[in-house]
Amino acid sequence: MKKNYLWMLALCGAMAFTSCIDNADNPSGPPESTSHKNIEEASVFSKDMDLSVYAGDNFYQYMLGQWLKDNPVPTKDGDLLIGAIITQKQNATKALAEITAKGQNLIAFTLLSLYDHDDLQSDSTLLMSKIKQIDEAGTKEAMLQLMAEFVKQGYPCPFVILPEVLMRKVYPGIEMLREYNLTSLKVERMGIPDKEAISIVEAGDKWQAYVKSKASKKQEKMLSYHYNPHEGVMLINTARRRSAGTDWIGTLGKTLDMDLSAIAADEDEMSMVDHLMTYNLDSLKLLAKYFILNRDYKYLPLKELDINTDEGSEGLFEYICDAATDQSSGLATSLSHSYTQHAIPESNKAEATAMFEEMRAAFRNRIGKYDWMTDVTKAKAMEKLDAMKYYCGWPDNWHAEWEAKLVAEETSYRLVCNLFNQYVDITRSMIGQTSDDAIFYADWMSMGAYVANAFYSPENNSIALLASNLVSPIYDKTMPSYYNYAVLGAQTIGHEMTHGFDNMGSKYNAIGKKENWWTPQDEQNFESRQKLLIDHFNKLQYVPDVYCDGKQTLGENIADLGGIEIAYESYMKNKVTASGGERDYLAREFYRSFAEGWKFNMTTEYALENFKTDEHAAPILRVNGIVNLTNEWYRLFNISDGAMYVAPDKRVSIW
């Protein structure tokens, strides 16, 4: 893709090279057998498979080898990453285009209807009036007050105010500037002298470098697939917090008419605010200009727009998707509503909800059978599982007061600015809410229903499954049930459910409060199993001679392993009535579907750049490193040797 949007930035691609598994550290080693013979049978996925590869050597290559050959990277368009999540993003983009073109969302339709090159002068005048306000600020105090006014207008200056959920209650939260796209050339096009343009961009670059250096958890995970936007958040008392002698949060609260005495944020974000207060007047002015111009440049009528609904409609893609996914855009909830109504059958939500309840029952059954936990800890685990909330697709009830309204504006740019204003008003109305609907809307406020994301929030003991997961390629009603249980079930629902009990989620109780509910011995047993899983992944290479970091990816690996075990048990119990060979065939198709769900190809360079710090293992390892820990995979595919073989007593089982 030439332009990255939140839903497409999936740092969980795969690659067309062989996964290397180091058996040197496995003292048991594979048996002497060297049969290396695959089971010969038809599969729904035959066109993607490479049967010249033994499933026990590289299950990922066995399943997807032909597809990888047929879909090389880089593509002719220069794409470094292709695959399932990119397809999901493209499907969502096309749906948004159709919804807009058909007038099914009046705000989006009006935005395009108003777009006119003749508006450039008046729009530029409005934008530059804000720059003039900055120039006229005579003191640091006046500049800080002006920045508070800009936050009220929806500018990330330096952050936006958004609804944040903590222990199932909506608090005011903050989110630092998400995307830095401004260049000096763009600034000059708006009539700002070249020297000042360079200084503005340099100020933005300096701030961006500082934010990155703080390594805020929320900032790091913002562009990840299946990221929890609430991670690292805590309730911070700001009533007496002064930064460099300035109570700017207090000033901001008065300006917004919002109680900011307690903010749901992480300490890194608050320290960034403290740092900003050390800026002098001139530095604040340059940075504020960056924040204003960086947001608004893309909404000025600077080029012709192609408003066709074809996939190649670049203008429509950019303008509507920017307005729908931009930080603090009021269009997000409105377009999310339209997307769920017009792009997703209502029955999909009911079916995904039923799948969740089946998997919850399967997980509960598994907990009861664990021999490494005492009954006391099992009871606590079941209590947490039973209390886990599941927010699927869209809220049960629609709330007009939490969605943007169409207002009369003369130009598209002015309407966009109004939508940002509305976002702040909606946030204000949500503070203090505790209903399930409010919690779901709060998540929509930060990403939109059309974003490819699902996440577990330990602070709320809840799973949010955004609506884009309820359509192909994640949930495909044209496919047999084994596909949907392996992809939506194992890789999404079961994965997120298990996050509630991974190395981090296990530290929170049923209501989202941090609490150690483990007996000392059970906690030790749990940590021992985690160590085994770390060791297992430390031996896996996703690029030749480049090993996975088992500790860094531990939480995701626990969730992957639990997800496939829970989904498989649920599928076999609830959907498979056949017996004997036919039953085993359907079970094998489940495992093949699991690999299909991680169908990606990426360049080696892209893999090296993204997986060095990613908490997710590379998808080739999320397949090979997971299936070879499940006993059923060995039985079903008749695996008794091969590079992936792990001796029975070395196969890690946690959840």
Task: Describe the residue ranges of each PLM region.
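Zinc-dependent metallohydrolase catalytic domains
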Residues: 145, 353-490, 494-655
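Noncatalytic, helix-rich "gating/capping" subdomain that lines the substrate-entry/channel surface
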Residues: 93-358
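Positively charged n-region of N-terminal signal peptides that target proteins for export
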Residues: 1-6
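N-terminal post-signal-peptidase region of extra-cytosolic proteins
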Residues: 40-46
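Hydrophobic/aromatic-rich, well-ordered segments within soluble, folded domains that form packed cores
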Residues: 49-69, 208, 554, 561-566
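Bacterial N-terminal signal peptides
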Residues: 9-16
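Active-site-surrounding "flap" and adjacent substrate/cofactor-binding loops of secreted or lumenal enzymes
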Residues: 36-38, 54-57, 62-120
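Bacterial Sec-dependent N-terminal signal peptides
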Residues: 16-37
